């Protein structure tokens, strides 16, 4: 029991469980004995009905859209705390992850197009390597435990959130045919209610969560990625202490173990099961997977490092306190873990054209993401000295 307690008390434990869940998913998806069970589990229909409102999705989408909204709620709470009281409190510090995220979206997209511009079909996947999977990136960073400076973790979180917001905007503008304006209107009203609650100093967490559920449902029905609702709710929950207690910090403390030991491992298990059946070297070296691999493995760190360097040279931003430029470069490599958001964009880009392209895109995403995870982790392990 002592060893078990020590494991769960470790900062790296959540990342270890997430990696185990991802490996288990890969093994099950590629085993004849378990692949059927694995995919049946993900396709299990789950229906929620309240009056005339009905949400009918399979298990995979409930995990990605509902449970991950809770993860994004936690991320929103942590980033808000750092924006108001921590390492992102000044304008120049806050500008740094914004500039990094812009570079991390532009350069991978351009590199992908360098491989695929001549093909009008695969060209549509230009946004695939522009995305970062914040859950897996943070999971890999967590493997390094307490030696990771808090400012570096917050930088990655802020960068990845901005990256995700950029991906959501790209999806809405380029990959979504039908946006429900009525649902977006309901979402706008819910956001206004959250703002009023915050301004009035309401501190009951349940009230914010209730409005958050309405917001999540509206965003889901609108056609925009529903996890965005979690970030929005997190930003409106009061951080300022009253009678020595902070609503946001208290909720952050409650959510952390649930996210680290249940939601993220379940997310990894549901999304990492990519089938390798039919994979060939010729297919892997075709322009589609090559463009994705290059975009994630080279474009992401190059874009983030280049734009960060320019921001520092032009004195537009400061390095996060206690970090080095080499560590920022390593985080840029971790941002090449595109995974689920990249797979989602690939399904939108090629789903109605040629489903076979989705499989090759997934392979490119898998190779690029795993390579980014291994190289980024190794570089950071060298650059970060264990705390004493």
From Swiss-Prot:
Q: Which GO terms describe its biological process?
A: regulation of pH
Which reaction does this enzyme catalyse, per its entry?
Na(+)(in) + 2 H(+)(out) = Na(+)(out) + 2 H(+)(in)
Fetch the Gene3D superfamilies from UniProt: Na+/H+ antiporter like domain
Which ranges sit in the Periplasmic compartment?
Answer: 32-58, 117-122, 177-180, 223, 273-286, 351-357
Tell me the name of the encoding gene: nhaA
Q: Does the keyword Ion transport apply?
A: yes
Cytoplasmic side: which ranges? Answer: 1-11, 81-96, 131-154, 201-204, 237-253, 311-339, 381-388
Q: Where are the transmembrane segments?
A: 12-31, 59-80, 97-116, 123-130, 155-176, 181-200, 205-222, 224-236, 254-272, 287-310, 340-350, 358-380
Give the way it sits in the membrane. Multi-pass membrane protein
Entry keyword set:
Antiport, Cell inner membrane, Cell membrane, Ion transport, Membrane, Sodium, Sodium transport, Transmembrane, Transmembrane helix, Transport
Name the chain's protein.
Na(+)/H(+) antiporter NhaA
Q: Which PANTHER family match?
A: NA(+)_H(+) ANTIPORTER NHAA (PTHR30341:SF0), SODIUM ION/PROTON ANTIPORTER NHAA-RELATED (PTHR30341)
Q: Its Gene Ontology molecular function terms?
A: sodium:proton antiporter activity
The record's subcellular location field reads: Cell inner membrane
